[in-house]
Design a protein with these regions (language model features):
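Amphipathic alpha-helical interaction modules
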Residues: 13-61
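Amphipathic alpha-helix face/heptad-repeat signature
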Residues: 11-18, 81, 85
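Short, charged, low-complexity amphipathic alpha-helix
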Residues: 1-10
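Amphipathic alpha-helical binding modules
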Residues: 58-92
Length: 92
């Protein structure tokens, strides 16, 4: 294996590790938010931060759970967050 592939493999491993850490941090937060009615500012803040990690399937599932829970409560904000996700992560 050449140095370029080695460096790329290390980078991928680091990103996967960061995603794992983010999931560990966001999972209880997502469960907490879905178990109550939080303020629009709190939900928006968490979704904005989670957006950076939505390339990770597990975090994307948490993001979607929060969006589903709050869609009827804060429809405009949730629509904005979903559109932000699409702009950032959708490749089509």
């Amino acid at each position: 294996m050449n140095k370029g592939n080695d460096d790329l493999s290390k980078l991928v491993a680091q990103i996967e590790h960061i995603n794992e850490l983010a999931y560990i941090q966001y999972k209880p937060i997502a469960y907490d938010l879905c178990g109550r009615i939080a303020s629009i500012d709190e939900v928006e803040h968490i979704l904005d931060r989670m957006l950076d990690f939505c390339g990770c399937d597990e975090i994307l599932k948490l993001f979607k759970q929060i969006c589903k829970h709050y869609y009827e409560i804060y429809p405009e904000m949730i629509a904005y967050e979903i559109n932000s996700y699409r702009e950032f992560w959708d490749n089509e």
